[in-house]
Amino acid sequence: MNRLLSSAVNLLLVLVLGVGLSGCVSTRVPTASSSPWKAIDLETQANPLDVSFTDPSHGFLVGSNRMIRETDDGGAHWNDRSLDLPDEENFRLISIDFEGQEGWIAGQPGLLMHSTDGGQNWTRLFLDTKLPGEPYLITALGKSSAELATNVGAVYKTNDGGESWEASVTDAAGAVRDLRRSSNGSYVSVSGLGNFYATWEPGETVWKVHQRVSSQRLQSIGYQPDGNLWMVARGAQIRLNDGDGNVEDWSKAIIPITNGYGYMDMAWDDDGGIWAGGGNGTLLVSHDGGDSWETDPVGDQQPSNFTRFVFDDDHAFVLGERGNLLRWVGNAV
């Protein structure tokens, strides 16, 4: 009898704990009544990786498998383009940026291209074989000027159209899984294993290393509109950097949804909405600083992981996989 009573008590305790825990963890969030995004099928198995525009109408999209597309209507439609590259090399075009009519493309392995006529013609620039790492991020800075960052945190700048490059750091950060640049020229990166992040400010010669704030490995990191940082860790954890200039002051973990898929990128829209994108069509938005979240109904229907947001003054895109792309059209969908 005592054994039976003990078993019943244990079962009741398990049920109580289960109910209690289910109130702390949400497996679903409400679905928004409308979406500002429109799905575009690029009809390719390549992954779109970056977008940049010469003006509000004309721009380019680049991606894996040498993919380059051109638009003349703000990104509603994309047409195939090609680059004069060796057929035997399957380049991954990872970054593109324009300043007016001058544009740059960075790719892997060892690819850098330059245009001075709005992308109608591209010239390949051959990089020094001693360049640390592979090109990862290119930023157009003005006439004949650009900044190149590699996947080991080396940063180089040119002021002569890419004929020569000057190193900005004396010691690279090591292999990175994510690297972002702010509008003022600062950089932040996540180490290849996700066990620490590093920051670099213009004028400094080395990266500053910072340990992660929890046992969860870091996935990605970037800049909020006010210059503070955001962080995404494994386990679908979001943290926001609250300190004024203190890059080690982080909020408690925000876990909007536990659907088994992590987040890969974040972005802020012009109205202050916070967007998080990730695996299996996960696309969430918060309109109250991260306190509550909604699922985007268009993103939820896409058979793709969302890997990156691209926002500029006139456009916004969510980049997926296998030709999946979302374009911002406003709250009309």
UniProtKB/Swiss-Prot annotation:
* Chief site of localization: membrane
- Signal sequence residues: 1-23
The record describes its membrane topology as:
Lipid-anchor
Keywords, comma-separated and alphabetical: Lipoprotein, Membrane, Palmitate, Photosynthesis, Photosystem II, Signal, Thylakoid
Residue positions of covalent lipid attachment, annotated as N-palmitoyl cysteine: 24
Q: Is this entry keyworded ATP-binding?
A: no
Record InterPro entries = PSII_CF48-like_dom (IPR028203), WD40/YVTN_repeat-like_dom_sf (IPR015943), Ycf48/Hcf136 (IPR016705)
Domain of life, source organism: Bacteria
Q: Sites of S-diacylglycerol cysteine lipid linkage? A: 24
Subcellular location(s): the record lists: Cellular thylakoid membrane
Query: Mind naming one GO cellular-component term on file for this protein?
Result: photosystem II
Q: How does it assemble?
A: Part of early PSII assembly complexes which includes D1 (psbA) and PsbI; not found in mature PSII. Binds to the lumenal side of PSII complexes. Interacts with YidC.
For domains, the record's comment is: A 7-bladed beta-propeller torus, about 55 by 55 Angstroms, with a depth of about 25 Angstroms and a central pore.
The record's HAMAP family line, in alphabetical order, gives:
Ycf48 (MF_01348)
Role description: A factor required for optimal assembly of photosystem II (PSII), acting in the early stages of PSII assembly. Also plays a role in replacement of photodamaged D1 (psbA). Assists YidC in synthesis of chlorophyll-binding proteins.
What protein name applies here? Photosystem II assembly lipoprotein Ycf48
Q: Which gene encodes it?
A: ycf48
